[in-house]
UniProtKB/Swiss-Prot annotation:
Gene it is expressed from: rpsP
Superkingdom of source: Bacteria
Source species of the chain: Deinococcus geothermalis (strain DSM 11300 / CIP 105573 / AG-3a)
Annotated disulfide bonds: none
Swiss-Prot/TrEMBL GO biological process terms: translation
Membership in a protein family: Belongs to the bacterial ribosomal protein bS16 family.
GO CC terms, sorted: cytoplasm; small ribosomal subunit
Protein name: Small ribosomal subunit protein bS16
Length: 82
């Protein structure tokens, strides 16, 4: 199953996340199909959340399932999530 989920990067005590499309059987930080954007939970910059809404809508239309956190972030960016 194809999922839209967060993949962690950054350093110790300074997490950043990529919002990626990946196969659900892959490891959290393993390879992914497409990178949709990024999220900084510490909100250290003005653009702490950036998502390519057009590509996210495409992946949702072909059946990708977002995780609960990814769904919340997609909604925050105005992407229609069923």
């Amino acid at each position: 199953m194809v999922k839209i989920r967060l993949s962690r990067f950054g350093s110790t005590h300074n997490p950043h996340y990529r919002i990626v499309v990946t196969d659900s059987r892959r490891p959290r930080d393993g390879g992914y199909i497409e990178n949709l954007g990024h999220y900084d939970p510490r909100k250290t910059t003005e653009n702490y959340l950036k998502i390519n809404a057009e590509r996210a809508a495409y992946w949702l239309s072909v059946g990708a399932q977002p995780t609960q956190t990814a769904r919340r972030l997609l909604k925050a960016q105005g992407v229609k999530v069923a």
